[in-house]
Amino acid sequence: MTRVDLNADMGESFGPWKMGDDDSLLKIITSANIACGFHAGDPDVMAKTMALAAENGVGIGAHPGFPDLQGFGRRNMKVPHDSLRNLVRYQLGAALGMARAVGTQVRHLKLHGALANMCSVDQDMARACYQGALDVDPDIIIMVLAVTKQEQAVRELGCKWVGEIFADRAYNDDGTLVDRALPGAVIHDPDLAGPRMLKMVRAGAIITESGKHLETSVDTICLHGDGPTAVQIARSVRACLEEGGVSVTAFER
């Protein structure tokens, strides 16, 4: 039976300001990418989200991003590679410490927002970020945007990794994500997202906006926890996959 992981970005609330319905998502997904305080989140939110993930049997991932709370980590920043390594080391270190404190562990790491998008087209930048993570935990699983420079970087490093596709984002023909500023870049319709993911999993490929198939290993499917229909999309994707004979389960370390 085909198996695939279902992940979501979360832990992005800050103080009294709430973003996303993490409690509901954690009952549907199998992996959680938890913000590390730079683009979103705070220590209390991180601790609570990790504890809830562990309670629900959901695999925990560190989700480092640029230091940009106001821009939610979605604005490009020019950062030297040495600083990028330290940026990732710092955030992963915090995640590992918090996970241990609440009685669980971090299994994987996934870059956030603009940092991830920039690394999807710049292999040297991706390598710097991932080397920073491996310096802290050589056994960490790196979650990468499949078929992009991120995947090339982890293949070069020879580390553990899984390939990710998106349930709620449209694709360019090179495997990168369509710019959020463009119409149709973000998918909000659960009735579209679920069947679309089943089609890609069965094809073993990313299907771009032009209809091009980019063959890849579909190890995990992501949806953004901050979207207005995130919970509905998660339910739709999981239901469509399971009805289509796909087992939704966490990937193995």
From Swiss-Prot:
Transmembrane segments: none annotated. InterPro entries: Glyco_hydro/deAcase_b/a-brl, LamB/YcsF/PxpA-like. One of its GO terms (biological process) is carbohydrate metabolic process. Its EC number is 3.5.2.9. Keywords: ATP-binding, Hydrolase, Nucleotide-binding. The keyword Hydrolase applies. The keyword Manganese does not apply. GO terms for molecular function: 5-oxoprolinase (ATP-hydrolyzing) activity; ATP binding. It catalyses: 5-oxo-L-proline + ATP + 2 H2O = L-glutamate + ADP + phosphate + H(+). PANTHER family: 5-OXOPROLINASE SUBUNIT A, UNCHARACTERIZED PROTEIN YBGL-RELATED. Belongs to the LamB/PxpA family. Catalyzes the cleavage of 5-oxoproline to form L-glutamate coupled to the hydrolysis of ATP to ADP and inorganic phosphate. Forms a complex composed of PxpA, PxpB and PxpC. This is 5-oxoprolinase subunit A.
